[in-house]
């Protein structure tokens, strides 16, 4: 099973809100996931919370990080 850390969209139409999740790469964007490690709200200034220890753990065990997650967590 290839795991990936990516965003899943929640929230209303025209008002996005994202969870940072670990999931199987073959699953759809918003389908089942293994673990939620944080959230990101692009409409608010500096609204990003995630567990850096869990992100490091998943990277260590081989999970790939999506480009968008890598960009927002590197800030």
From Swiss-Prot:
One of its GO terms (cellular component) is small ribosomal subunit. It comes from the Bacteria. The keyword Ribosomal protein applies. Pfam families: Ribosomal_S16. SUPFAM superfamilies: Ribosomal protein S16. The keyword Hydrolase does not apply. One of its GO terms (molecular function) is structural constituent of ribosome. This is Small ribosomal subunit protein bS16. It comes from Campylobacter hominis (strain ATCC BAA-381 / DSM 21671 / CCUG 45161 / LMG 19568 / NCTC 13146 / CH001A).
